[in-house]
Amino acid sequence: PVGTPTAVVQIIHGLGEHSRRYLHMISALLDAGFVVIADDHAGHGRTAMQSGVWADAGDNAAEVVISDELTLQQQLAGQFDDLPWVVFGHSWGSMIARAMATRPGTRLDGLALCGIVAQPRGFETTLDHKTLAKAMA
């Protein structure tokens, strides 16, 4: 970021996307003083291009991606303990972000959701609506 960082923004992209799709947003956030963290989900981005398999993180894709995003937080959290942590999720990424918000130990001081989608079949057990409502209150 330019100057002293003010917060961390973790970007979680949607299904079939990749983190580079958000370069314009990443650039604006960096210019505004934010630390930006963005990765590609399993089966997305460069990995998918090289393997030819798109948007496939396996049979338990949601849990795989949630686990990956939480691992990313854990790996980087020590570097940014003094900064607020905002999770931004777009489309399927908004579902991942909402699920993360219900998990104990998730680093979350702010939640920004874009292109919010409904909860599809199979995602019911991932979200705890009472905990999510409490986290967002």
Please identify what each model-predicted range represents.
Residues 96-137:
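Alpha/beta-hydrolase-fold enzymes
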Residues 57-78:
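Alpha/beta-hydrolase active-site loop
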Residues 19-23, 46-49:
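Short N-terminal helix/helix-N-cap motif within the alpha/beta-hydrolase-1
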Residues 14-17:
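Active-site glycine-rich loops that stabilize anionic/oxyanionic intermediates
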Residues 80-91:
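Alpha/beta-hydrolase fold nucleophile elbow
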Residues 28-52:
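Conserved alpha/beta-hydrolase
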Residues 1-5:
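Short beta-strand-to-loop junctions in surface cap/lid or active-site-entrance loops
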Residues 12, 39-41, 114:
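Alpha/beta-hydrolase
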